[in-house]
Amino acid sequence: MVGWLRLYVLDDNEPAPGFRSEWGWSVYLEAPGWRAIFDADTSPSIIEYNAGELGVDLGRLEWGFLSHHHYDHKGGYPAIARARPGLRVYVPPGETGDMASWGLEPVVVKGPTRVAGDALSTGPLSSGLWGIEEHALAVEVEGLGLVVIVGCSHPGVDRLAEAAARAAGARGVAVVIGGFHGPSRATLDRLAGMARWICPTHCSGSEAKEYVRTTYPDKYCAARTGSVLQVDRDGPALERY
């Protein structure tokens, strides 16, 4: 377990003043002993610019994580390759060509996998009709539980949260943050039954954000491009929004 986890939102659809943004999602993760990147937006230039504004060094990354193959999550990885050539990136099945061509080292995840001592992949879940294989990242924070970072949640954000808990041998999850892909209220209700904090971003949609904010105000947390969240045993605290 880590004592704390800090999340720097490099890109979300909504930017804070002074940041650049487009449709995409990317988070720089920092914990005691490692730094990683979860997804990488659409644009290398936006990743580089916002990393500079947030004061994070892409060259210090130790590993990367790609939730699924859509370009608004992987298109900025050339910037990562420039800063950290040969970086190991955990990817779902079928997602190796672009990463390798950009000079990164794709590692295909076929099931629940520890990617660091205190971080694990849920393993890929299928979205059924769409045929998209997507996995989520879970980090165990001491005294709190699992922080689950999702990309677009094509298989369902509730299913990804359940898979994270199952992979970690936990009863539930503490925090879920990322794109929820326009979820139904029933999906959000199920998520609220297993998560203490819910942070919808990216493709979640304004209706989902408002539903969580008004129906579960004690569980809601917000983030956008430029946000910095510190997560420890007390839960997520927004250091910068």
Positions of the model-derived regions?
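Active-site metal-binding motif and surrounding structural segment of the metallo-beta-lactamase
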Residues: 45-90, 165-175, 196
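Active-site neighborhood of phospho(di)ester-bond hydrolases with catalytic His/Asp-centered motifs
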Residues: 37-41, 61-69, 90-93, 148-152, ...
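Conserved beta-strand hairpin/beta-sheet module of binuclear metal-dependent hydrolase folds
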Residues: 5-54, 134-150
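Short Pro/Gly-enriched beta-strand edge/turn motifs at strand-loop
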Residues: 2-15, 116-124
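Structural motif
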Residues: 5-8, 35-36, 63, 87-89, ...
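Metallo-beta-lactamase
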Residues: 91-135, 221-241
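Cap/insert and terminal regions of metallo-dependent hydrolase folds
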Residues: 73-76, 145-146, 152-231
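Catalytic core of the metallo-beta-lactamase
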Residues: 25-27, 37, 108-169
